[in-house]
A protein has these predicted regions:
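Substrate-binding cleft of carbohydrate-active enzyme catalytic domains
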Residues: 115-299
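Contiguous, structured surface segment used for ligand recognition
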Residues: 1-118
Length: 299
C-alpha cells in the first residue's frame, strides 16, 4: 500500500510532547513543501482525528535517540525518544520523501543508533575561513544523516580579543558566530565541540612580532612560507612560562562559547619539541615526559 501527501495533509504534535518537537515539525514541513509543493499546517492537539495526517510524538520509554516510523495508507506516525528520537524519525521520513515524492510506500521502521557518538571533524583553519552561513548548511547536512557531533577545528580563524596580529589579514569567526552556531546545532541534535590548536603548528600566532619569541625553533617567523613548514613547525617553547599562560588564555576564551561538555585540546603534532629551546630539558627528562607535563598543565 501507499500513503499520499495531500494538499490538506497536516502535521500534528501530541499535546503532551515537549516544545522542541515544533522545530522537527518545521523541518518536515519545509521538506514536504520543497519536494511536493504542498505546505502542511502544523497543529498541536490531543487525539487529532482524520486521515492523511502525520503525527509526531515523544516517548520516554524509548532508548536515547531511538524512534519508530509507521507509514500506513491512512496516516504517518513518528514516535521518538525525548532526546533527538523524533528528529531522527523526521530525517528518515525526509529521505523517503526525496526518493518517493508525495506517494510513500507503507513501512514500519524501528531504529536506534549502533554508535553513541557519531562525529564529523571540520577544519576551519586551512584554506578559506568558513562563514556562519556555510557552517549552518554543514550542520543541517550532518543532522540529515544523523551525525550528532561536530568538532570545529580552529588555529587563527577565531577573532581572539587581543590577538589582532594573528587574524588581521583573515575573516575570522566571531564570538557571536560561535554562539549562534552552537544554538543552531543544538536544535539539530548536534553537540558542537570546540577544537583548538594549543601546542603544535601555531603558525600564524608564532609568526607575530608579539609572540615569535615563544616558538621552539628560533627564526621560524622569518622563514619563507610553505605548507609543509606551516604544519611541521611552530611549536610552543615550553621552557618559557609565557607559553603556558598564552595557551591557557586562548583556551579559556574559546571554550566559554560552547555548551558542550567536551573540549579537544589538539595538543598534537609537536614535531619540534626537544629540538630547539627545549633541547636541554628534553635530554634531561625525555621528550615524552616534558610533553606530558605541559599537556597536564593545560588540562
Amino acid at each position: 500500500g501507499t500513503f499520499t501527501i495531500h494538499y490538506d495533509s497536516r502535521i500534528f504534535l501530541d499535546s503532551e510532547s515537549p516544545a522542541e518537537l515544533f522545530s522537527a515539525a518545521q523541518l518536515l514541513q519545509q521538506e514536504i513543501e520543497t519536494q511536493t509543493g504542498f505546505r502542511p499546517a502544523i497543529c498541536r492537539r490531543h487525539q487529532p482525528v482524520g486521515s492523511h495526517l502525520i503525527y509526531l510524538t515523544a516517548s520516554p520509554e524509548l532508548s536515547r535517540e531511538a524512534y519508530t516510523l509507521a507509514v500506513t495508507p491512512e496516516n504517518i506516525t513518528i514516535c521518538g525518544s525525548l532526546e533527538s528520537g523524533v528528529l531522527y524519525g523526521v530525517q528518515t521520513l525526509r529521505q523517503m520523501i526525496r526518493q518517493a515524492g508525495a506517494v510513500l510506500p507503507t513501512v514500519l521502521i524501528s531504529d536506534k543508533p549502533a554508535m553513541e557518538n557519531r562525529g564529523f571533524y571540520h577544519d576551519a583553519t586551512r584554506g578559506r575561513v568558513p562563514t556562519l552561513s556555510y557552517l549552518k548548511q554543514l550542520a543541517a547536512t550532518l543532522s540529515f544523516y544523523k551525525i550528532n557531533q561536530l568538532q570545529l577545528y580552529i588555529e587563527h580563524s577565531y577573532l581572539f580579543d587581543d590577538l589582532t596580529e594573528m587574524w588581521r589579514d583573515d575573516t575570522p569567526l566571531t564570538a557571536e558566530d560561535i554562539l549562534e552556531l552552537d544554538r543552531y546545532c543544538k536544535g539539530l541534535g548536534i553537540d558542537l565541540v570546540p577544537s583548538l590548536a594549543s601546542f603544535g603548528h601555531l603558525y600564524k600566532l608564532l609568526c607575530t612580532k608579539s609572540y615569535a619569541h615563544l616558538c621552539e625553533l628560533e627564526g621560524s617567523a622569518s622563514a619563507p612560507f610553505s605548507f609543509y613548514d606551516r604544519q611541521a613547525h611552530h611549536t610552543l617553547d615550553i621552557t618559557n612560562p609565557e607559553s603556558l599562560s598564552l595557551a591557557k588564555h586562548i583556551l579559556s576564551e574559546y571554550m566559554q562559547l560552547f555548551s558542550s561538555k567536551y573540549f579537544n585540546l589538539c595538543a598534537d603534532e609537536t614535531f619540534d619539541l626537544g629540538k630547539g629551546a627545549s633541547r636541554a630539558l628534553a635530554e634531561e627528562k625525555g621528550t615524552t615526559v616534558i610533553y606530558t607535563e605541559f599537556v597536564t598543565e593545560l588540562a
